[in-house]
Structures are given as structure tokens and as C-alpha cells.
UniProtKB/Swiss-Prot annotation:
Protein's recorded name: Beta-galactosidase BgaA
Thermal dependence of activity, per record: Optimum temperature is 30-40 degrees Celsius for activities against both pNPAp and pNPGp when incubated 10 minutes at pH 6.0. Both activities completely lost after heating at 50 degrees Celsius for 20 minutes.
Assigned keywords, A-Z: Glycosidase, Hydrolase, Metal-binding, Zinc
Binding site for Zn(2+): 107, 148, 150, 153
Listed Gene3D superfamilies: 3.40.50.880, Glycosidases
Protein's gene: bgaA
Family named by the database record: Belongs to the glycosyl hydrolase 42 family.
GO molecular function terms noted in the UniProt entry: beta-galactosidase activity; metal ion binding
Active site feature: 142 (proton donor), 298 (nucleophile)
Amino acid sequence: MRIGVDYYPEHWDRQLWEKDAQLMKEIGVKVVRLAEFAWCKLEPIEGQYDFKWLDDVIEIFSVRNIEIVLGTPTNTPPLWLYEKYPDAIQVNESGERQFIGIRGHRCYNSSSMRKYTKAIVEAMTERYANNKAVIGWQIDNELDATHCCCDNCTEKFRGWLKNKYSTLENINKEYGNVVWSGEYSAWSQVTAPLGGSPFLNPSYLLDYNRFASDSMVEYIDFQREIIRKNCPSQFITTNTWFTGNLPNFYDAFENLDFVSYDNYPTTNEITDEEELHSHAFHCDLMRGIKKKNFWIMEQLSGTPGCWMPMQRTPKPGMIKGYSFQAIGRGAETVVHFRWRNAIIGAEMFWHGILDHSNVKGRRFYEFAELCREVNKINEEIPDYKINNEVAILYSSDQDFAFKIQPQVEGLYYLQQLKAFHNALIRLGVGTDIINWSESLNKYKVVIAPTLYLTDDNVTTELYRFVEAGGTLILTNRTGVKNMNNVCLMEQMPSNLKECAGVVVKEYDPIGHSIHTIKDEAGKVYQCKQWCDILEPTTAKVIATYNDDFYIDEAAVTVNKYKKGNVYYLGTVFNSDYYIELLSKILDEKELPYYKKLPYGLELSVLENENGKYLMVFNNSNEIKCFEGKHEGKSIIRNELDGKSFTLEPYGIEVLQLVE
């Protein structure tokens, strides 16, 4: 458990390097990330490398026992490369090459880009392989499943399709290309998605996103092999995010040592209740990718803003609180972006720890306090794990398929997952967010929102889970299509209808209209966006619609199947219904939860060989009182706390539990 910073010595005069490193040491910074955007300084002329300045920086930090993560600088190739090898630049959906001088516009499949990627990564790793201060490598920066439409990508996509389908006849059949006379008769007719039209075949678009993700993964592995060969004792990761075309995270990190994530909680006022815990959701998802703790490689440090209007300045407590939020979700190292506000370039208003004035301000002193507290806690909890018995299933394929053909205004795949996650946080229940194809053996409750695409292996595991006594929650838009994004000719939820004990006889995409349902006790709840009109076969109806032509029709059901239960939610709710339903399910499964946890509080239970630790984070701008279940000793203040205590806005407490 440690705190670090992202540092850009190439932006600053040398006299600042020593001062910055010394100040970092004094306040307890343990690690810095360097060089991920510095290609033009490392190779100013093709084939001529200059590592002297980086050697000096590493030495400055090394003598102060601050460890180094080096980034491969391939996100920002130098202009000489783009000028000489324009095929290295991405082509957009209009068939135009992107403008040079902007980051992230390299093509993963360009042979020129691969050639010079290999050269710079070989040179860096050979030089720093035996440098004890360098503990690891970050590959590139914030890669995504870029939809490049250049000739290289088109040719590679054809090869990808040949490997998957063998023949054009098979592609035509699986995609249904007969629609609008879209059948291929020659491989030359297969292109990247030029035009970017939503009228393009949805099966083709889903496959192109898979290809784009695979291209990104291949580029990661291309660099990983070089680094692993030259630096076998140093870790390898890459930093991902939740912007752009999201890749298959599980493929991306399969061969890397751990996940790294760039975490920028909003500093603006949150008016949507369901977005309050959005970044807790992201962190839980990151932990679930490799089922172990992860790093934050970029963490909020100040006012965000560059190519967009600036957001609000972080309120007192936010910098420390959001760092602890990530730690409580499994982030064993939190690296803050950035040490200094840039005074040059496009990111000069994406604020860091030290302002343009170079005067230590409120954010600096809060960051220093964070470093002290994390270093203290690390002495007590040097290694920890998070063990949960509730899981939410995530699939990048589902997410992208939903984006290709939006179902109704307001209904988004990730929001469906976040709604359940938000309710579980409100109940103080820890949740794993895992790949939808994972084994479910360790869980008692599994939530599988919007299984829009149907996979036979996933279906088999879900049946096995329920048959063994697990509780499964399904939602609307389940069992709509096969994995090629083609609609199934059977009643939803298709191959899950036996265990669900229900079929969808009709549906109504209501969008932003508000309807209501009534539960067994006669309590009324609002619903929105989508209404599946359900017809039970063996399931019990536990809520009915209260509006429209389907008044009194089934809205929510539960079915006893073998040793387990399957709930089917035909509509989308506000948090009150999810909280009510999940409370009943948690009672049934004898899982602990908090009935009256104040709004905004987030709980995490950390475990190691010394016992269990409860982290409580007040994710709100109000003082909150926590009513606990166990006595505990405060790790931060080294004193015994009772079961109850108050937290300042964005405040944090860590207790060693006395059970």
C-alpha cells in the first residue's frame, strides 16, 4: 500500500528535479512514473538515442529510495516518424489520416509503427534492465480498441475474418449479409467500417470491435515480449480507463502482471444518485479482471480540464478520500497525476499537486497527509485481500452490442450494472465485478444484468450455479441475440427460460416515461426505460405493472430451480426497489448487510493474516455518522473506537475489527 506521482522531468528545468525529488521524499512519496510521453526526447533523431537526461532523473530518485515505473513512449511517436512513415498514423471513418502532433493517433497494425516500437522498447529495456530503482514498466498509455480504417487494418481484418469464418459464404450466412444486397463475393469487398454509419450490419460492427480489441491486445503483447525478454525481474502492466472504445479488458491483461487504471472521480456536484458510486464500480471491475489487487496509475489530484471546460476544484478531503476509496477496492498503489501543473502544452489546466505558482497550497498539504496515513496503514496492513460472496457479471461484447443498436433512450448496459452495484453499496455489501465467463463457485448471489448476447458456455455455468443452490438475478434484454449479434427466433430469455420459469410475451420500450409496479405487499415503486411483459411458466409473480395496457401483468418473478432461485426483473428501477429486493435475497442467503447505512457511506472489508479491517469512506459533502456492528481499533489514530463514529465530508476511517 503506497502513494506515488506521475512526473514529467522533460517539461522542467533541471534545477527543479532535485528539489522535487527531495520534497517527494520528505512527504512520503514511494514511487514515480516517468517517460510515457517522452519519445522525442529519448530518440530526437531516427536511430539516435539520448538517455543521459533520463539516467540523471532516475539517479536523483534512486538515491532517495523512490522507485521508478518507466512508460514505453509509444502513445506519442515523434514527428519525424509520422513525417517519414505516414502509414503509422490512424485513418478515421471518413478515410482521412488523423492530424499528427496529437497523442494516441498511432496505428497498432502499421508495420512502420511496429518497427520503431520495437526499436525504442528494445533500447529502453536493455538500458534499464539491471537498474534496481526501476521496478516495472507501463506499456504505452490508455490504449483503447481504436477503430482505425487504414489499409493495414483492412488487410488484417480480412485475415481475422478468414481465421474465424474460413469463407465468405460463412460470413454472409452468419452476418445475414443478404439484407440490402450486402453479400460479399470477393475478399476485396471486405473493408474497415468507413463512414461509421449506424446502418452498417450490426454483426459486422461487433466483429470489427472485437478485431480492434484484438489488435490492441496484440500490440500490448508485442511490447510485453520485448520487455519480458530483457527485464524478467521487473513487472509489466498497462493503464486502462473508461473512455473511448473499451477493449476486452480480460484479454488485454491476461499476460500482464497486474491491472493498472486511471481514476478521475468527478469533482462536480453529482445530481444523479446512481452516479455517486460510479468510480467505486470501476475499481471493483478492475480488481475483478485478474481477481487480485491492482494499481491506480493516474489518480485525481486537482481540477480537471484541458480540451474541455474545467470542472470544480476538489473539495477539502476529496484527494485523500478518493485515494482511500480506491485502496479499499483493491488499489495497492495509487499514483497521482500529476506532481506539478504543466505550464506548457494541452494539459496545462489538468491540475496536479503543486500549482503553477509553485506555492504549496491546500491540495499539497492534503496530499502530504495522505502519504503519511497510507505509509502508517501499510505498516499495519502490508498485504490484504478482498473476499466477497456477491458478484455482478460484466461483458465487453454485451456493452458494445448495446452501443451498436441502442435499445431505447436512457437504457445503457453499464448503467444496468451500476444500478445493482449502487444498491449493494447502499447496503454495505462488498461486490466482485467479474468476467461473465468466469466460474461462479465462490459466490452465493450472482447478478447478470442484460445478457443481451447468448453464450452456451455461460448458460451452462449459470445453470450449474443455480442447480447447486445459488441465487441468480436476470434482467430485461436477456437472451435477445446469439454471439454474432443476430436475433434469436425464440421467446426471451431464450436458453435461460427454463431456470427463470418465465418468458417475455411482449415488451414496451418506454424510455424516459415513468411507470409504476406494485409488489406483493402492495408497495408501489417507479420503473422506467423498458418493460418486459412476463408470462410465468413455473415462476412466482412478486410484482406487477400498475400502468398502461399491461396493468396487472407480471413485472418481476422468482423461480425455484433445483436447489437455487432465479429472479427475473422485467423493468428498470430506481435504487429503492433494488435495495428492497436485495435485502430480502441477502436475508435468504444469510449474508450480512446494513439496513440503514447513511447515504454516501462506502464500506470495504480488507483481510490479511492478522484479521479483518473495515474501511469506511464518506463519499459526500456532509458529516455522516456510522453505526457499526463490531468494536474496532482505529489504524489511523491508533486508538479504540466504539461501534459508532462520525466522518467529515470525504473522510475516512480504517478499523481493525474486534469480533
